[in-house]
Amino acid sequence: MTGPIDTPLGPGKEFDRIRAMAARWGARARGLGDDCAFLEAGGERLAVSLDLSVEGVHFTREWLAPAEIGYRAAAAALSDLAAVAAEPVALLLGLAVPAGESDDTVSQLADGVADAAADCGATIVGGDLSRGPGIVIDCCVIGRASAEVRRRGARPGDRLVVTGALGGPLAALLEWRAGREPPPAARERFARPASRHAAARFLAAHRARAMIDISDGLAGDLRHLLAASGVGATLEVERIPVLPDAAKLAARLKEKPWSFAARSGEEYELLVAVPADEAAAVVAECPVPATIVGTVEAEQGLRATERGAAVRLADGFDHFGTP
């Protein structure tokens, strides 16, 4: 693709704004649109990404301890490295806190970031600290991209595979908003997202053609992967793996579990397109649970079926979409 966006983005106001910025930048930018930027340095191929976590948008203090806030913010950034199968190496931390914030809170935020980095083999190598109206955590992550997998590359006939079980973060969010403490498994999925770096390297070794981490919901991020690859897909929604806690809450809300799971964001599980002849081995041998959920097709657009009958999927999360 010509212009600064190498990898086309899916629909949404947030991504319209990114496209508009890229158009204004023109030749002053390059390589935009994927989970990471790729740079050559000292003979190595590096993957670099940056992720913000903002108080009142991504978390509130009523829900999480400071160390959990820090851990979650860093894990979200590091997940971008997993999305391209890069090995985490380094993290730079930008942190803003209110002027009257306690030293203990700042220390716990920093400890959470350090723990998330250490859990996947990255080292904190620098950062910045500032005053602000609320907590903002900005993590820049760097990894070795020896087995680079991007969002683009899915081909007709490929099978779509998702790691883990979905719905936990949305279940936790809705329970907190209702004034209830979430079930432990759902809370853990929200507060301490699991690292999927080993799974990402396994998937890359099994000829993964395209990959993305699920941050805006399975439905939304699948649309991004399809747009990047210039293909379409059918998602077999009854195959979507659902966390039991999420399925229970969906039943209380009179929503189908697959629908609940498909719109749950900030999962940080992996969605990958693999050749059909690799799909069975991927599911059987992946170091974390993995499930085939659909098939890539030549006809563009996302279609969803439940046991063969067409169904509608919710849109993915959009920071500037309609509430």
Please identify what each model-predicted range represents.
Residues M1-A65, L93, A116:
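Extreme N-terminal cap/leader segments of soluble proteins
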Residues T2-A20, L64, P98-T123, S130-I137, ...:
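Glycine-/charge-enriched secondary-structure boundary and capping motifs
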Residues G3, G43, S53, P88-L174:
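Glycine-rich anion-binding loops of enzyme active sites
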Residues A29-L32, A47-L50, T123-G127, V141, ...:
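General beta-strand structural signal in soluble alpha/beta enzymes
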Residues P66-A90, D111-D119, R201, G220-L225:
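Small-aliphatic-rich amphipathic alpha-helix that forms the alpha element of a beta-alpha
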Residues C139-R150, P184-R201:
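Active-site glycine-rich loop that binds ribose-phosphate moieties when present
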Residues L170-R187:
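Short, compositionally biased
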